[in-house]
């Protein structure tokens, strides 16, 4: 070892320190570091420096000015004027647009006379929102227009009706099915408000050669597009097949709303009374039929001539009908017949899909499918009723009751599919009534006895006191079909009708039943009658005739009662006149095949006495309701008393 180093022969000298290790010098901590600036760069700001610069921009806030005096303006609860709300209807936010519509509705409901003063602004501001993309805005618009159209009279709304119909039709043709469906709510309002304008020239939608462009045509074409069916005009232009094909997938609720609106549209186009259509084939003389249908109708003043287009007939078709009318018994197809040809495939397929859920054997019923089936059958009934009656009228004009209905196989196909579902009684009473009338239409058109298992069904209905007036009138064609057809139980139905009359307490139903039975009693007086009325002969006619003075007394006292509304008083007074007229006709006849004429006249006299005066045991003679009748009714009663024994 030499001086702290060891010498080894192989590794050489190995150095190591024999003293302690030397400490490294530590630098003091620095609070801030100074960044070295680069050449040509400015001084950088500190990391904790506060930016005190600002930028200003001018904005316009005319609707939120605190300096604006609105103490004398009509405002909403949010202090918004009509001008503010009109501007907000164009706002990009759906919520603001909806609030604007509801704000205008608030102004209309709050301030009397505001609608009449600002009618144009209130309507025109909301019209563009009929086809809005937001569902809540469309719902608010429908509610808004429902209030406006209810409060506006027809004269005030007339200038805005065409624009509203155009925009409603545009919304019904929107690319979104949701917008189309919601537009039907507004269409329903317009059909109630301006029915004639909304359905104007609707038949042109079925004619490919028509150059018309009216609201009714556009609306019906919109319905065709929504249902996915092709109209005659479209098929002729595009060369499509005659079978309708559905190209639009619709849910149950959507199809229900479309068919409900379509039914309302078609019912508006058909405002004629069709309760007596079933008697058209019972008369060989058109004059007798016209007189029979006019029985018990209220007197009408002379109607003014109106200019209207001839529906569904071009000049060429009229010429062909005039040339070949004398040799052909087949009337030209009406607009309703062509329409039922177009809608039949789509309606039938939808109906067959819905009926199993309605007429389920286990008793479970889908309310949505039940309503859907009801609206489909109502559309069918309306179209087939107009189709059959138009052919019967054409046959009566030619002096024959045998007419050819080209589209009748479609009705036969419909009844074939419906028969299994209506073979037994069910809770769907209104569907059974429609089915019965469809069967009556087919039977009258074909003049062939159709198997109708409705006699027990009708007897059950007539034994129930809950029969409504509308249901009773809908059953009139079925009643006539049964009593005029040689089938088992037809005499029982006639007896049930006469017995059912004595149990009626509803005044409207009592009036409808009287007019129907009185018409049946007048049938033997027509020479051109060609219907089988053997079932009408029953001893119960005597009882029914002698019960009419009681009906006359009830109606007469109600007509002058202070509890009756003006409409109820008018209806009761009309029933009084109808009963007096019928009894006078009966008294004028030398004999009647239905009852003992002499016996009835002798029994009527004492039963009519209370109408003139009543002997009270304490107060003595009291004047009857006769003294409060109009002069014309008093003269009618006097004429009746001269034909029977003096009261």
Regions flagged by a language model, labelled:
Residues 89, 100-111, 129-130, 141-152, ...:
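Hydrophobic residues within the alpha-helices of tandem HEAT/HEAT-like
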Residues 57-72, 101-113, 142-154, 191-210, ...:
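Boundary/linker elements of alpha-helical solenoid repeat scaffolds
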Residues 92-94, 133-135, 175-176, 231, ...:
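Short inter-helical turns and helix N-cap capping residues of alpha-solenoid HEAT/ARM repeat scaffolds
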Residues 344, 348, 352-647:
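Long alpha-helical repeat scaffolds
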Residues 15-75, 231-241, 245-417, 421:
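Acidic, serine/threonine- and proline-enriched intrinsically disordered linkers and terminal tails
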Residues 124, 131, 135-136, 141-278, ...:
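Fungal eukaryote-biased detector of long internal structured cores
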Residues 52-127, 131-159, 331-354, 358, ...:
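Alpha-solenoid helical repeat scaffolds
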Residues 75-86, 114-129, 156-171, 196-229, ...:
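HEAT/HEAT-like alpha-solenoid repeats
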């Amino acid at each position: 070892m030499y001086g702290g180093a060891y010498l080894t022969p192989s590794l050489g000298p190995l150095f190591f320190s024999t003293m302690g290790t030397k400490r490294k010098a530590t630098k003091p901590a620095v609070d801030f570091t100074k960044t070295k600036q680069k050449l040509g760069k400015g001084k950088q700001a500190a990391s904790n420096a506060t930016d005190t610069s600002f930028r200003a921009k001018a904005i316009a806030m005319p609707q939120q000015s605190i300096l604006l005096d609105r103490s004398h303006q009509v405002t909403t609860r949010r202090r918004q004027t009509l001008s503010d709300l009109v501007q907000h209807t164009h706002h990009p936010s759906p919520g603001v647009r909806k609030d604007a519509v509801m704000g205008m509705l608030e102004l209309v409901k709050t301030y009397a006379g505001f609608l009449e003063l600002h009618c144009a602004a209130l309507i025109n501001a909301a019209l563009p929102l009929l086809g809005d993309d937001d569902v809540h805005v469309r719902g608010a618009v429908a509610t808004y227009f429902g209030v406006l159209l209810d409060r506006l009279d027809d004269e005030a709304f007339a200038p805005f009706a065409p624009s509203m119909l155009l925009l409603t039709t545009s919304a019904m043709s929107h690319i979104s099915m949701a917008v189309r469906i919601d537009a039907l709510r507004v269409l329903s309002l317009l059909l109630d408000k301006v029915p004639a304008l909304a359905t104007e020239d609707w038949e042109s939608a079925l004619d490919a050669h028509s150059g018309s462009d009216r609201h009714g045509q556009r609306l019906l074409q919109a319905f065709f597009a929504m249902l996915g069916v092709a109209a005659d005009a479209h098929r002729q232009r595009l060369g499509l097949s005659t079978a309708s094909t559905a190209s639009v997938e619709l849910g149950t609720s959507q199809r229900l709303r479309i068919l409900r609106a379509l039914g309302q549209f078609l019912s508006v186009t058909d405002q004629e009374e069709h309760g007596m259509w079933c008697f058209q084939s019972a008369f060989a003389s058109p004059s007798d039929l016209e007189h029979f249908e006019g029985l018990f109708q209220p007197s009408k003043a002379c109607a003014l001539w109106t200019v209207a287009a001839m529906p569904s007939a071009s000049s060429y078709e009229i010429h062909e009908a005039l040339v070949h009318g004398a040799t052909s018994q087949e009337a030209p197809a009406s607009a309703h017949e062509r329409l039922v040809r177009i809608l039949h495939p789509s309606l039938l397929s939808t109906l067959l899909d819905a009926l199993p859920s309605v007429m389920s054997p286990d008793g479970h019923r889908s309310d949505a499918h039940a309503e859907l089936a009801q609206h489909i059958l109502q559309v069918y009934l309306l179209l087939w009723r107009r189709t059959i009656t138009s052919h019967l009228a054409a046959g009566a004009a030619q002096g024959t009751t045998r007419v050819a209905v080209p589209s009748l196989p479609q009705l036969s196909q419909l009844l074939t599919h419906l028969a299994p579902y209506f073979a037994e009684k069910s809770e769907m009473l209104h569907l059974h009534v429609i089915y019965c009338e469809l069967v009556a239409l087919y039977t009258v058109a074909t003049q062939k006895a159709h198997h109708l298992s409705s006699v027990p069904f009708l007897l059950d209905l007539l034994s129930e006191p809950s029969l409504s007036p509308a249901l009773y009138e809908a059953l009139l064609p079925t009643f006539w079909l049964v009593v005029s057809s040689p089938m088992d139980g037809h005499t029982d139905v006639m007896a049930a009708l006469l017995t059912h009359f004595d149990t009626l307490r509803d005044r409207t139903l009592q009036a409808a039943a009287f007019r129907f039975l009185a018409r049946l009693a007048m049938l033997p007086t027509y020479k051109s009658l060609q219907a089988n009325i053997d079932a009408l002969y029953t001893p119960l006619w005597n009882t029914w005739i002698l019960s009419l003075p009681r009906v006359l007394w009830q109606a007469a006292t109600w007509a002058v009662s202070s509890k009756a509304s003006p409409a109820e008083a008018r209806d009761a007074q009309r029933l009084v006149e109808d009963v007096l007229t019928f009894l006078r006709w009966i008294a004028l006849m030398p004999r009647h095949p239905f009852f003992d004429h002499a016996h009835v006249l002798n029994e009527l006299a004492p039963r009519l006495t209370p109408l003139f005066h009543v002997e009270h045991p304490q107060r003595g003679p009291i004047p009857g309701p006769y003294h409060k009748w109009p002069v014309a009714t008093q003269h009618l009663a006097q004429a009746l008393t001269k034909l029977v024994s003096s009261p």
